[in-house]
A protein has these predicted regions:
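Charged DNA-binding/catalytic regions of mobile-element recombinases
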Residues: 1-157
């Protein structure tokens, strides 16, 4: 998980995303007008509620991710916490790659006037990213295909 700045016509907002390392699928995301931890906690809670708990959860060492509100959610769920080395962007390369894609294919092409407009447009892009954008690292599969292909199949009764 990580967050990044999103420039707007006037000012900027912050975009946080939880990414599955295996499939590169964005599991949850949030926009915020502040850097407070709450929007990161919300994205984390959504990812855990909708996709279950991973064995390990990785972030950088930002205050949003080291505070009790955030780490408490992971500890309560029994998830091991992993943090990148200071300034070591390569430790979270899959999220950094997402930021490059979302910025160059969506954000930098727009000048959002409102937070609502940014939320709608970024949401549309992330749905495209998960469902229709193939990745060479995934053997030309989309993140959705890679994510759902690895889940165990249940037989119909």
């Amino acid at each position: 998980m990580d967050f990044t700045y999103v420039p707007m016509a006037r000012g900027f907002v912050y975009l946080a995303a939880v990414v599955d390392w295996y499939s590169r699928r964005v599991l949850a995301w949030r926009l915020s007008i502040t850097m407070e931890a709450a929007f990161c906690v919300e994205a984390l809670e959504e990812a855990l509620a909708c996709h279950g708990k991973p064995d390990v959860f990785n972030t950088d060492q930002g205050s949003q991710f080291t505070g009790q509100d955030f780490t408490g959610v992971l500890l309560k769920a029994g998830v091991a916490i992993s943090m990148d080395g200071k300034g070591a962007w390569r430790d979270n390369v899959f999220v950094e790659r997402l930021w490059r894609s979302v910025k160059y294919e969506e954000i930098y092409l727009r000048a959002y006037d409102t937070v609502g407009e940014a939320r709608t447009s970024i949401g549309r892009y992330l749905a495209f990213y998960n469902g229709r954008r193939p990745h060479s690292s995934l053997d030309r599969k989309t993140p959705d295909q890679a994510y759902f292909d690895r889940l165990p199949q249940t037989a119909a009764a």
